[in-house]
């Protein structure tokens, strides 16, 4: 690949880098820890890869070198499930007395905060 019988010549490398710059090409090594590529049916994970990005006239090309590990992709995504929290009378009284609001307002704030006392009190305090 390199002239001179395949021996690496640092001076030749500098000349090649200068020529690349003259043609609008720039290369940079990235300090990547992990690279993940998601395919239709599997996921490729590169641990401790060598990643280089080349910029050629505004178009970036990424080169990843390393050993890839295949990981099976999950079949289905878990759907978000809305959970209704049961608000106790004690919680309603606590929020009502702390914020100086009616029990109805306190109960509504607790329901909106999914039963979180601190969040309900902060919401009513503002």
UniProtKB/Swiss-Prot annotation:
Please state the gene responsible for encoding this protein: nac
Kindly give the Gene3D superfamilies that the UniProt entry links to this protein.
DNA helicase RuvA subunit, C-terminal domain (1.10.8.10), Nascent polypeptide-associated complex domain (2.20.70.30)
**Domain NAC-A/B positions:** 10-77
Q: Lineage in the entry?
A: Archaea, Methanobacteriati, Methanobacteriota, Methanomada group, Methanococci
- Please state which protein family the record places this protein in: Belongs to the NAC-alpha family.
Q: How does it associate, per the subunit comment?
A: Homodimer. Interacts with the ribosome. Binds ribosomal RNA.
Q: Name one GO biological process term.
A: protein transport
GO MF, one term, reads:
RNA binding
Q: What does this protein do?
A: Contacts the emerging nascent chain on the ribosome.
Stated name of the protein: Nascent polypeptide-associated complex protein
The scientific name of the source species is Methanococcus maripaludis (strain C6 / ATCC BAA-1332)
NCBIfam families hit by this protein: archaeal-type nascent polypeptide-associated complex protein
User: What CDD domains does UniProt report for this protein, alphabetically?
Assistant: UBA_AeNAC
User: From what superkingdom does this record's organism come?
Assistant: Archaea
Q: Which UniProt keywords apply?
A: Protein transport, RNA-binding, Transport
């Amino acid at each position: 690949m390199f002239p001179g019988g395949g021996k690496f010549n640092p001076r030749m490398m500098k000349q090649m880098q200068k020529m690349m710059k003259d043609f609008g090409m720039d290369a940079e090594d990235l300090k990547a820890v992990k690279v993940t590529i998601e395919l239709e049916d599997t996921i490729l994970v590169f641990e401790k890869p060598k990643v280089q990005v080349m910029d050629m006239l505004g178009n970036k090309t990424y080169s990843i070198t390393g050993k890839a590990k295949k990981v099976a992709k999950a079949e289905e995504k878990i759907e978000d499930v809305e959970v209704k929290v049961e608000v106790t009378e004690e919680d309603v009284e606590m929020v009502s007395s702390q914020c100086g609001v009616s029990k109805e307002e306190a109960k509504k704030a607790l329901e909106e905060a999914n039963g979180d006392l601190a969040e309900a009190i902060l919401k009513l305090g503002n």
